[in-house]
Amino acid sequence: MIVTVTMNPSIDISYLLDHLKLDTVNRTSQVTKTPGGKGLNVTRVIHDLGGDVIATGVLGGFHGAFIANELKKANIPQAFTSIKEETRDSIAILHEGNQTEILEAGPTVSPEEISNFLENFDQLIKQAEIVTISGSLAKGLPSDFYQELVQKAHAQEVKVLLDTSGDSLRQVLQGPWKPYLIKPNLEELEGLLGQDFSENPLAAVQTALTKPMFAGIEWIVISLGKDGAIAKHHDQFYRVKIPTIQAKNPVGSGDATIAGLAYGLAKDAPAAELLKWGMAAGMANAQERMTGHVDVENVKKHLMNIQVVEIAK
């Protein structure tokens, strides 16, 4: 079983406008509301692929109830911890080819609610093979919270796929317990290391991933967007090349990549096939209008067209 963790979920609300007018009323009938947050995107894609998945995290108020109900309608198993404060909204206004976002900070999780979640997490990982941890931390959660989840998973011999950035990622990398896989994109890696990889990025990334902070992480997958990825498994590097596609909505493609990687791991896929599952799911997500969804037949089609090449040491 794969457990997905989303500690700061949201309702993603999208408004489509012909023109955004300031300081007046804007009306639209084209509105979508979906359960959001990186971990829930991962959840939906694993479910679309046919994987055995259960979603956990924290949900509160009417917004939390909406998310829980939407997952129930999609037949996605869930085991969230209830919190007192309201789960946030994330608003995207699509206008004139642009996207203007309004993102709420979200709820504050109390110490008692943190304890309740950790008890729930302890029970879930007893049944799990893989845990995915995605996105930001809600207010009230300590900056080393993900390190604690990784430690708990290690104790149960559960593989952790971590997709976060900034201080949350840095805290885990500096800690004694390492995730099984991380997937920063090139920009996030540059921010983490304070380096510029614009010149000769392939060689620069290879050198960077041998730094001591990455020791003990079995898989590091660096997303290069339309240029594919560079990956490191133990001491072996891989270059992943993907075909050009017509993207409809690239939002959530990184989350879909994590979902594909988790699904491949659950299938005990060998290295090259594992990377193909990740890239194929990310590509298929970009071809859907709805974030965090894939067409399985499209994923399988992409699997045939992705090249994975070992980079000579």
Swiss-Prot record:
> Highest taxon of the source?
Bacteria
The protein's UniProt keywords, in alphabetical order, are: ATP-binding, Kinase, Lactose metabolism, Nucleotide-binding, Transferase
Which pathway does the record list? Answer: Carbohydrate metabolism; D-tagatose 6-phosphate degradation; D-glyceraldehyde 3-phosphate and glycerone phosphate from D-tagatose 6-phosphate: step 1/2
Write down the EC number.
2.7.1.144
Name the GO cellular-component terms: cytosol
* UniProt KW ATP-binding keyword: yes
Q: Which reaction does it catalyse?
A: D-tagatofuranose 6-phosphate + ATP = D-tagatofuranose 1,6-bisphosphate + ADP + H(+)
Q: Which InterPro entries match?
A: Carboh/pur_kinase_PfkB_CS, LacC, PfkB_dom, Ribokinase-like, Tagatose/fructose_Pkinase
Q: Which PROSITE patterns match?
A: PFKB_KINASES_1, PFKB_KINASES_2
**GO terms of biological process kind:** D-tagatose 6-phosphate catabolic process; lactose catabolic process via tagatose-6-phosphate
Annotated Pfam families: PfkB
One GO molecular function term of this record is: ATP binding
Query: Which SUPFAM superfamilies would you find in this protein's record?
Result: Ribokinase-like (SSF53613)
- Top enzyme category: transferase
Q: Which family does it belong to?
A: Belongs to the carbohydrate kinase PfkB family. LacC subfamily.
The name on file for this protein is Tagatose-6-phosphate kinase
- Gene name on record? lacC
